Amino acid sequence: MFDYLENEEVALDELKQMLRDRDPNDTRNQFKNNALHAYLFNEHCNNVEVVKLLLDSGTNPLRKNWRQLPH
């Protein structure tokens, strides 16, 4: 997944579409993509639309997943 993010424009478009299509009532996989969310927050994603969609999808920016981060 992270290799895919090398093409930033395609990745952002796909991510926006994925977040838009997400069922807001399905909370079973709320943190399924937590590593991706952590990556975007830690890389200081400057795309306002993506950040809004992440927050709307239930991402908690205060939740740290230290095990997913390289040391």
UniProtKB/Swiss-Prot annotation:
InterPro entries: Ankyrin_rpt, Ankyrin_rpt-contain_sf. Keywords: Early protein. This is Uncharacterized protein 17. It comes from Vaccinia virus (strain Western Reserve).
